[in-house]
A protein has these predicted regions:
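Intrinsically disordered, low-complexity regulatory segments
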Residues: 1-168, 247-248, 254, 363, ...
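Basic, low-complexity terminal or inter-domain segments flanking catalytic cores
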Residues: 2-33, 43-44, 51-53, 125, ...
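Phosphate-backbone binding and catalysis cores of DNA-processing enzymes
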Residues: 26, 47, 94-268, 272, ...
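Conserved short loop/turn motifs at secondary-structure junctions
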Residues: 30, 110-112, 187-191, 272-281, ...
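Short acidic, hydrophobic short linear motifs in intrinsically disordered regions
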Residues: 267-270, 278-292, 319-328, 483-495
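A short, conserved structural fragment
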Residues: 311-326, 517-526
């Protein structure tokens, strides 16, 4: 039984009173109560089970650790103190009322550790014995899967509950103890986490590699040749005088170019080989997230939200509410025998016998995989993406299509390629020409045509040993070695998975958290650490190297797996972790304060209020200068003063007439008066005359949330405003000004600014939906 102390409290004026524990009084003549997590899932399952069942939603967790206290009794075996979630009070009340009206209860929360824990909490709230057969699990919301689960309930898996509880308590201990320590070192509001801090560290260390990287120059040579039949092909220089061609500068390259240019070369060898390119396995959570980032430009958070929608089901005319994919939190590539029996005939009938392998493709599992669920796949082959156009939203359909294509391809025959390689000799220079021709497309029939075209490499005409070919062109090209790339969402998720940090279900919230905390920002889809991110990582590496590192975090994940498997106990894992953590925390409390005083960075800027030399501090938006005599003197200044004189603008303050200076805030640069402190936004004039008043200009502004928009310079006299950038063109249909929207991919879309114009994007979308 999980170690817990359950404290159920409610606020009544200023007093806290203990609630009376709920005692269930089942109604033998009532319905069967099934509790799931979401209303959408409840609706689908109730339709499947029929009138004898009442299906209700818990809306996620109903109990958790308290928000205002740590909620973990360290001295009592790390027992968590659970409280009812105040925003779920009505849900709890409705569930308890239904529990008394029904004859029995089945807990059908998600089939993972989190779902197991929710079921355990529900058993406590609804007076159900967790050791009775009350837990049902299914990996797809289809009639066969639901009915099979109903017939085979099990007791709640208390080992899995302990594993989830251990993760929750570990995260609470680290966050509750480490975050206040960071507040003292940097500024209030920061947070540290067992996994998020390691993810931030990876990003910071990659940035350090990039900054330290020294590019090295090298050159390559590519030559064009023509056969006797006037067929052209290209070849690359590979060797000079029998040694690898290493060209370090332009002089060496020019010499090689002169030795090849205009001269004939002899074909000394031609080799041909066939190879099979095997298909990839169906999606796991992490591979789905990676492909959604790379191919659909979705964030991992958005991907999981859309996948949840597809799993819980959508309303399909003639079929009711249908769950379209299997459970989306999985690390398994396994496919059920039942689905294999469906997909093989589908492939042979739809694409032909040649596309069906002799036996089903089976994929090996990674050593970290728990393999508790199937891979992510469609629940039925009756709903191809083409049948769901107009039913699913655009983004839902794009993700569903990605999952569908990957699954079908995973059970198709391999692609067959023929590779041809020809070696050319021109004096001391050896060149190589290669060509790849696809003989059979196999599983790549499921890929977009652009990608398939790219797999056919350079054309290579028929060549044989002894042929003489003539050079028609030769080029030397300069290159520089490149630093390692910054992490994207996709590459960071891949790295976290490879290193065993976190679990598939945690990746999206981790990436979301480190951005919200401003430890990292995104530039061109790549993660870039902020000054705050660097500072926090530096402190954690220095004082908490024992726990905030890749190996320790990965090992801890393995111990959580062992708890779930019954091979380790909650208490032992927590005790071993806390022993290391408490020692590092105690040491850090002493050493960090000592180092802070000794290594305080002092600037050359003098505080005009008390005469002290101002010190450098770190704030939410980066470095700033503060008076060391705080709290007696609370003077602060921008850090830019420490780097030189302030940049003065040519804009005068409206209040006092002083020339304003440039400052940087959370939404970028702005103007500030050094005399009276008045602020003013930096106005960027588009040069476009306001289409409403025809007097002012359209200028770039920011909303109170920081979003850029374009408004008339005569505001408030003229309230003309547009979200997209206006351009000096007018709509041919209605005469309104045109606007330009630039997407993250760099794509620009020009459209009419008038929402009532037939050509406006939203108007066209509404018209299409109406037609359907």
């Amino acid at each position: 039984m999980p170690i817990t102390r359950t404290i159920t409290i409610e606020k009544k004026k200023t007093r806290r009173t203990r609630q009376v524990a709920f005692k269930r009084k089942p109604n033998p003549k009532g319905k069967h109560l099934v509790v799931v997590e979401s209303p959408a899932k409840a609706k689908t399952i109730e339709r499947i089970l029929g009138p004898d069942y009442k299906v209700m939603a818990s809306m996620g967790h109903l109990r958790d650790l308290p928000k205002r206290t740590m909620g973990v009794d360290i001295e009592n075996g790390f027992a968590p103190e659970y409280v009812n979630s105040t925003d779920r009070a009505n849900v709890i009340k409705d569930l308890q009322k239904a529990a008394n009206q029904c004859c029995d209860i089945l807990l059908a929360t998600d089939p993972d550790r989190e779902g197991e824990a929710i079921s355990w909490h529900l058993s406590k709230l609804l007076d159900v014995n967790p050791e009775d057969k009350v837990r049902i699990a299914f990996h797809e919301i289809t009639p066969p899967a639901i009915r099979e689960a109903i017939q085979d309930p099990e007791p709640i898996d208390l080992d899995r509950v302990d594993a989830q509880q251990a993760r929750r308590v570990l995260d609470r201990l680290v966050g509750y103890k480490l975050s206040p320590w960071l507040w003292r070192q940097v500024y209030r509001g920061l947070s540290a986490g067992r996994v998020q801090s390691v993810a931030t560290r990876l990003i910071c260390e990659r940035e350090e590699e990039i900054r330290a990287f020294v590019p090295v120059e090298y050159w390559s040579i590519e030559a064009m040749y023509k056969t006797e039949k006037k067929e052209s092909f290209k070849a690359k220089l590979t060797q000079i005088d029998g040694k690898d061609a290493e060209l370090h500068n332009g002089e060496e390259t020019d010499a090689a170019v002169k030795g090849i240019e205009g001269k004939e070369a002899e074909v000394t060898a031609v080799t041909k080989s066939r190879k099979q390119r095997k298909t990839k396995p169906p999606y796991t959570t992490s591979t789905m997230q990676q492909d959604a980032v790379n191919k659909l430009n979705f964030s991992s958070k958005k991907t999981m939200m859309l996948a949840q929608n597809l799993y819980e089901g959508v309303e399909i005319p003639g079929h009711g509410h249908v769950g379209l994919i299997t459970y989306m939190r999985t690390d398994s590539t396994r496919i059920s025998d039942e689905m294999i029996k469906q997909v093989r005939p589908y492939i042979s009938e739809t694409y032909g016998e040649d596309y069906l392998p002799a036996k089903p493709n089976v994929f090996s599992k990674s050593k970290e995989a728990q393999d508790a669920h199937e891979a992510i796949r469609p629940t039925s082959l009756s709903f191809p993406p083409s049948a769901l156009t107009g039913i699913l939203s655009r983004d839902q359909l794009r993700l569903y299509t990605l999952i569908w294509n990957r699954f079908i391809a995973s059970q198709m025959a391999p692609q067959i390629q023929q590779s041809t390689s020809a070696t050319l000799q021109c004096g001391i220079y050896t060149l190589k020409a290669t060509g790849v021709h696809v003989l059979f497309d196999g599983f790549t029939i499921m890929q977009p045509s652009k990608k398939k075209d790219s797999e056919e490499s350079d054309f290579l005409p028929p060549l044989k040993k002894g042929d003489i070919v003539k050079n028609t062109k030769v080029n030397g090209e300069q290159h520089f070695t490149a630093p390692p790339p910054r992490y994207t969402e996709a590459s960071l998720i891949k790295t976290l998975e490879e290193k065993g940090i976190g679990r598939p279900s945690t990746y999206a919230p981790i990436l979301d958290t480190i951005q919200k905390r401003r430890y990292v920002t995104k530039e061109n889809k790549q993660f870039v650490p902020t000054e705050v991110g660097f500072k926090v990582t530096e402190l954690l590496k220095k004082y908490f190297e024992g726990i905030i590192n890749v190996d320790f975090t990965a090992n801890l994940e393995n111990w959580l797996d062992k708890i779930a498997e019954g091979k380790a106990t909650y208490k032992k894992v927590m005790t071993d972790f806390y022993k290391v953590f408490a020692a590092e925390l105690e040491s850090a409390n002493v050493e960090a304060e000592k180092d802070k005083k000794e290594n305080q960075e002092v600037s050359d800027v003098t505080c005009e209020k008390c005469g002290a030399k101002m010190i450098v501090k770190m704030g939410r938006y980066g470095k700033y200068l503060a008076c060391p005599n705080y709290p007696n003197c609370k003077n602060i200044k921008p850090y830019s003063l420490a780097e030189g004189p302030e940049e003065v603008s040519d804009v005068k303050c409206d209040a006092c007439g002083t020339l304003m200076v440039y400052r940087t805030g959370p939404y970028g640069r702005y103007l500030k008066c050094p005399s009276c402190g008045a602020n003013k936004a930096i106005v960027i004039d588009t040069g476009i005359v306001c289409p409403k008043c025809h007097e002012g200009h359209m200028v770039q502004r920011r909303s109170h949330r920081g979003r850029i928009f374009y408004g008339c310079s005569r505001y408030p006299k003229c309230d003309m405003a547009l979200w997209n950038e206006p351009i000096n063109k007018f709509c041919e249909t209605c005469g309104a000004i045109m606007t330009k929207k630039t997407y993250k991919t760099g794509k620009e879309v020009i459209s009419c600014s008038n929402p009532d114009c037939p050509t406006h994007p939203k108007r066209k979308t509404r018209a299409k939906k109406k037609e359907k």
